[in-house]
């Protein structure tokens, strides 16, 4: 079962200021831990004036159709590729479940701030219950993205 989710946010800081915070390991860790991560590590793969690539490894409690399972832990890896010239972030998630998650986020300057357009593609490779899982994942993005953008703005305000 495949599904897409898209949202736009108007932010009170420049695209560069927001991008700098979205790449900040402290923000990445805070964001992941706000969603229940037990351990978070960020490893740079490549960084120059044109692009920045890194992996985010997260250890969290297991998840199933009924929710969190504290008797087991799961590891997931998100590979992030920034095109710094276009302020575009592309990411791919891989984990313990038959789920493919990819996304693209684009920052543009607008007025005295910026706009962040976020999108994710969800593909659940589970027969029968895949539709339910995809719906829960989509709802998770819709619930968490506003919280994430608020956190990014809080981090940007500390730097201003």
Where are these regions (language model features)?
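A generic structural micro-feature
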Residues: 1, 48, 68-74, 95-99, ...
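Hydrophobic ligand-binding cavity/cleft-lining segments
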Residues: 1-60
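Intrinsic-disorder/low-complexity, polar/charged segments enriched in Ser/Thr/Lys/Arg/Asp/Glu/Gln
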Residues: 2-8, 51-53, 75-77, 88, ...
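Amphipathic hydrophobic-ligand
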Residues: 34-37, 69-76, 97-104, 137-138
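Glycine-rich portal/gate segments that line the openings of hydrophobic small-molecule binding cavities
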Residues: 41-92
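Beta-strand/loop substructures that line and gate deep hydrophobic ligand-binding cavities in soluble
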Residues: 81, 90-139
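Acidic, low-complexity intrinsically disordered segments
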Residues: 141-151
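Short, highly charged C-terminal tails/helix-capping segments
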Residues: 150-160
């Amino acid at each position: 079962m495949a599904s897409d989710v898209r949202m736009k946010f108007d932010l009170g800081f420049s695209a560069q200021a927001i991008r700098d915070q979205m790449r900040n390991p402290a923000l990445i860790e805070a964001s992941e831990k706000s969603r229940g991560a037990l351990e978070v590590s960020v490893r740079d793969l490549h960084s120059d004036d044109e692009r920045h690539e890194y992996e985010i490894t997260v250890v969290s409690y297991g998840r199933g159709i009924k929710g969190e399972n504290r008797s087991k832990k799961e590891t997931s890896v998100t590979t992030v590729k920034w095109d710094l010239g276009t302020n575009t972030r592309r990411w791919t998630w891989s984990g313990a479940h038959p789920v493919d998650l990819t996304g693209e986020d684009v920052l543009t300057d607008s007025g005295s701030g910026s706009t962040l357009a976020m999108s994710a593609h969800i593909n659940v490779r589970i027969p029968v219950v895949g539709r339910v899982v995809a719906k829960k994942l989509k709802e998770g993005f819709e619930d968490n993205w506003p919280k994430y953008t608020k956190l990014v703005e809080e981090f940007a305000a500390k730097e201003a």
